[in-house]
Amino acid sequence: MISMDKKDLTDRRPDILEGAPLHYAPKNELGVVFLFSHMLKKLRLTIDIIQPQYPDCIAYQKVGGGQKKIRIEFEFKSRNFKSQRHNPKGCDWIVCWEHNWPDIPNT
């Protein structure tokens, strides 16, 4: 008989991402940042700053003949933005893996 403890049940692998640079779905914010970095060309973005303080990232998006500054906060779950009490006015995009904040402010 095989015995399983509670840890065995919580250590299951996340979903497989077919054709993505990360084999499995992210389990944390760093995985979100990694996947986002592979979307830069498609989103027409260049990164200016990545930092540990809010906002996590300053990027520029090609728009017409110019560039638009985009302030980005990375979260694994969108609701983490609220629990960290960030000011929504200091951020243009919340990039997350799981959107679980139904009353997200519309700024």
What label would you give each PLM region?
Residues 101-107:
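Domain-level recognition of nuclease-like catalytic cores that cleave nucleotide substrates
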Residues 42-44, 92, 107:
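Structural alpha-beta junctions
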Residues 56, 79-81, 102:
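Short, well-ordered alpha-helical microsegments
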Residues 58-71, 87-89:
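Active-site beta-strand-loop-beta-strand hairpin of nuclease catalytic cores
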Residues 50, 73-75, 96-98:
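Short His-Asn-centered micro-motif
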Residues 2-53, 60-63:
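Acidic-basic catalytic patches of nuclease active cores, encompassing PD-(D/E)XK
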Residues 83-99:
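Short secondary-structure subsegments characteristic of cysteine-rich extracellular domains
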Residues 73-83:
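Short beta-strand-loop-alpha-helix junction that forms the active-site gateway
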